[in-house]
């Protein structure tokens, strides 16, 4: 029987993986957090906090640290992957020898496969087969606020309704962590990935001093781009008005806790991409997602002007000023 006391294993000890592990443990699920760096895991075990990524948030008693992947997966039926999108394929290769028939896979990674633009669900099914229940967690949740126990809400989409309801009942907490079920895995994955690209655009706009009107226009036209792409892939339009669509987009475009927004701000103020990423010091998912989103839009024949212009800036040397001119100079059209 699945209960809130059933263990969960989280793979990925960065800021977001740690925050989710803290949340699950605090909500009553014995949680095992695995990281690829044994020294980092040992440090967290000693200090009972992730000083590198989430300083001053003390771990609950039922949060266990693990550097042995096989052992970490042995503890739990439910395996939650929280690694950067560029490392997603690699972690699938690592876990494959340790998967058992009873395992169920969830990921909170927001992105598309590097160099192909494929949905992560497609990558999972190709590498691991279609026999496992799969789910994705996505929504407007900054790691620090989540770890601090501040009120948050998130979307859970799964390919198995029973699995979705069981996992929802385990991690949902009425004290401040609300989990909404959505059956549209495609839409939930796309919203989480491409909002990072639009957030870079919002940051660039603010960095150039264009103001709140321009930022709001980018958010609004950004959700239109995401929705068009989603429809071309069979997603439900309503998904993009929910937590994993508009909710995550607004959060990421408007708050400086977002690395993607901060990255864009630096670009708008004249820094190059390499220097901006070095200043942030952590993975900027939107940098990689921009190329993949552009490739995916090209394959699908979907017009995504904001995404295309950010791609031109990051990978083709176009200036922020020329990007702005291109977007503002587009022909008149209906909304």
Swiss-Prot record:
Q: Looking at the UniProt record for this protein, which Gene Ontology cellular component terms does it annotate, in alphabetical order?
A: cytosol
Q: Which UniProt keywords apply?
A: Cytoplasm, Lipid biosynthesis, Lipid metabolism, NAD, NADP, Nucleotide-binding, Oxidoreductase, Phospholipid biosynthesis, Phospholipid metabolism
Q: Which PROSITE patterns match?
A: NAD_G3PDH (PS00957)
**Keyword tRNA processing annotated:** no
| Pathway(s) | Membrane lipid metabolism; glycerophospholipid metabolism
Residues the record marks as active site: 195
Q: Which domain of life is it from?
A: Bacteria
Residues binding sn-glycerol 3-phosphate are: 110, 139, 141, 195, 248, 258-260
Q: Which InterPro entries match?
A: 6-PGluconate_DH-like_C_sf (IPR008927), 6PGD_dom2 (IPR013328), G3P_DH_NAD-dep (IPR006168), G3P_DH_NAD-dep_C (IPR006109), G3P_DH_NAD-dep_N (IPR011128), NAD(P)-bd_dom_sf (IPR036291)
A GO molecular function term, named singly, is:
NAD binding
Its recorded reaction(s) are: sn-glycerol 3-phosphate + NAD(+) = dihydroxyacetone phosphate + NADH + H(+); sn-glycerol 3-phosphate + NADP(+) = dihydroxyacetone phosphate + NADPH + H(+)
Which biological process annotations from GO are given for this protein?
Answer: carbohydrate metabolic process; glycerol-3-phosphate biosynthetic process; glycerol-3-phosphate catabolic process; glycerol-3-phosphate metabolic process; glycerophospholipid biosynthetic process
EC number(s) of the enzyme?
1.1.1.94
UniProt xrefs under Pfam families: NAD_Gly3P_dh_C, NAD_Gly3P_dh_N
Q: Where in the cell is it found?
A: Cytoplasm
Chain positions recorded as NADPH binding sites: 15-16, 36, 110, 143, 259, 283, 285
Question: What does the UniProt function comment say about this protein?
Answer: Catalyzes the reduction of the glycolytic intermediate dihydroxyacetone phosphate (DHAP) to sn-glycerol 3-phosphate (G3P), the key precursor for phospholipid synthesis.
Which PANTHER family does the UniProt entry name for this protein?
GLYCEROL-3-PHOSPHATE DEHYDROGENASE, GLYCEROL-3-PHOSPHATE DEHYDROGENASE [NAD(+)] 2, CHLOROPLASTIC
Q: Which family does it belong to?
A: Belongs to the NAD-dependent glycerol-3-phosphate dehydrogenase family.
> HAMAP family from the xrefs?
NAD_Glyc3P_dehydrog
Task: From the Swiss-Prot or TrEMBL record, give the protein name.
Answer: Glycerol-3-phosphate dehydrogenase [NAD(P)+]
């Amino acid at each position: 029987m699945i209960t809130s006391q059933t263990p969960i294993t989280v793979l990925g000890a960065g800021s977001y993986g740690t925050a989710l592990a803290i949340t699950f443990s605090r909500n009553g699920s014995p949680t095992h957090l695995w990281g690829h760096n044994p020294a980092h895991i040992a440090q967290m075990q000693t200090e009972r906090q992730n000083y590198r990524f989430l300083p001053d948030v003390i771990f609950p008693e039922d949060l266990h640290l693990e550097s042995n992947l096989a052992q970490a997966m042995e503890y739990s039926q439910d395996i939650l992957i929280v690694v950067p999108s560029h490392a997603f394929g690699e972690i699938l290769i690592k876990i494959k020898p340790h998967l058992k028939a009873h395992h169920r896979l969830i990921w909170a990674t927001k992105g598309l496969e590097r160099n192909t633009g494929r949905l992560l669900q497609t990558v999972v099914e190709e590498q691991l087969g279609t026999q496992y229940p799969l789910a994705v967690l996505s929504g407007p949740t900054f790691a620090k606020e989540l770890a601090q126990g501040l009120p948050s809400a998130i979307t859970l989409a799964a390919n198995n309704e029973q699995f979705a309801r069981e996992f929802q009942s385990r991690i949902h907490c009425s004290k401040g962590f609300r989990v909404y079920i959505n059956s549209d895995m495609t839409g939930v994955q796309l919203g989480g990935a491409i909002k990072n690209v639009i957030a870079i655009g919002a940051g660039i706009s603010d960095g150039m001093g264009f103001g709140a009107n321009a930022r709001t226009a980018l958010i609004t036209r950004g959700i239109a781009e995401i929705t068009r792409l989603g429809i071309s892939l069979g997603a439900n339009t309503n998904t993009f008005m929910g937590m994993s669509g508009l909710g995550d987009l607004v959060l990421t475009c408007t708050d400086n806790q977002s690395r993607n927004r901060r990255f864009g701000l630096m670009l708008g103020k004249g820094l190059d991409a390499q220097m901006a990423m070095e200043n942030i010091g952590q993975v900027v998912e939107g940098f990689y997602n921009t190329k993949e989103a552009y490739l995916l839009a090209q394959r699908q024949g979907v017009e995504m002007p904001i995404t295309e212009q950010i791609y031109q800036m990051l990978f083709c040397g176009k200036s922020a000023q020329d990007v702005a001119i291109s977007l503002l100079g587009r022909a008149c059209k209906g909304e």
